[in-house]
């Protein structure tokens, strides 16, 4: 499996009990959704390796999981802090105007006046809407290092072109 086709969806946490269970830290929109995306791949020593989910459950306010062939605390402890990835092909297709964060990260952001504001370095979730975190160009004319631009499709974000990796926004470069 090619590494560039894998998207990180979470991380294995500390062990739970003595039978190989691990805490799961999900970075999916709904925490339990991490279990819908199968098969999992674990990044061990820089390489993605397949892993089979045997079982999962809620425990208090946490998610815990049991992986096949991880049968004791020592085996589980060796996987603590390992990233969980899935092949991008398992993600459902989205409707027009909806985008996965991993598709937006790395896009150039240009305002309506044609000024290149920088590159999307990450996404942030707020209570009301997602926010583009845009790392400004080194010699930004406005002295900015970073811009936070709300991802409000049609209001602020006018166009997203994933083939050219550009996002056009109605946003003042001075902000």
Curated annotation (Swiss-Prot):
Lineage, opening ranks: Bacteria, Pseudomonadati, Pseudomonadota, Gammaproteobacteria, Pasteurellales
Biological role stated in the UniProt entry: An accessory protein needed during the final step in the assembly of 30S ribosomal subunit, possibly for assembly of the head region. Essential for efficient processing of 16S rRNA. May be needed both before and after RbfA during the maturation of 16S rRNA. It has affinity for free ribosomal 30S subunits but not for 70S ribosomes.
Top-level taxon: Bacteria
Bilayer-spanning residue ranges: none
Record family assignment: Belongs to the RimM family.
HAMAP family associated with the record: Ribosome_mat_RimM (MF_00014)
One of the GO biological process terms: ribosomal small subunit biogenesis
Self-association state and partner proteins as the record states: Binds ribosomal protein uS19.
Keyword Electron transport: no
Keywords: Chaperone, Cytoplasm, Ribosome biogenesis, rRNA processing
Organism, scientific name: Actinobacillus succinogenes (strain ATCC 55618 / DSM 22257 / CCUG 43843 / 130Z)
A Gene Ontology cellular-component term: cytoplasm
Domain PRC barrel, first and last residues per copy: 96-175
Protein known as: Ribosome maturation factor RimM
Molecular functions (GO terms): ribosome binding
Pfam families on file: PRC_RimM, RimM
PANTHER family noted in UniProt: RIBOSOME MATURATION FACTOR RIMM (PTHR33692:SF1)
Comment block on domains: The PRC barrel domain binds ribosomal protein uS19.
Entries under InterPro entries matching the protein: PRC_barrel-like_sf, PRC_RimM, RimM, RimM_N, RimM_N_sf, Transl_B-barrel_sf
């Amino acid at each position: 499996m090619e590494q560039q086709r894998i998207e990180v969806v979470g991380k294995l946490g500390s062990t739970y009990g003595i039978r190989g269970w691990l805490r799961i830290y999900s970075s999916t929109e709904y925490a339990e959704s991490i279990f819908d995306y199968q098969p999992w791949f674990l990044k061990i020593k820089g390489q993605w390796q397949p892993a089979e989910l045997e079982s999962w459950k809620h425990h208090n306010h946490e998610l815990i999981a049991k992986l096949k062939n991880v049968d004791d605390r020592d085996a589980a402890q060796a996987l603590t802090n390992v990233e969980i990835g899935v092949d991008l092909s398992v993600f459902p297709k989205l409707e027009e105007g909806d985008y996965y964060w991993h598709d937006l990260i790395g896009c150039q952001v240009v305002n309506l006046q044609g000024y290149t504001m920088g590159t999307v370095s990450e996404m942030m979730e707020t209570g009301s809407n997602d926010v583009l975190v845009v790392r400004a160009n080194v010699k930004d004319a406005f002295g900015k290092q970073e811009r936070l631009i709300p991802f409000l499709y049609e209001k602020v974000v006018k166009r997203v072109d994933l083939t050219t990796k550009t996002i056009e926004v109605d946003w003042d470069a001075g902000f």
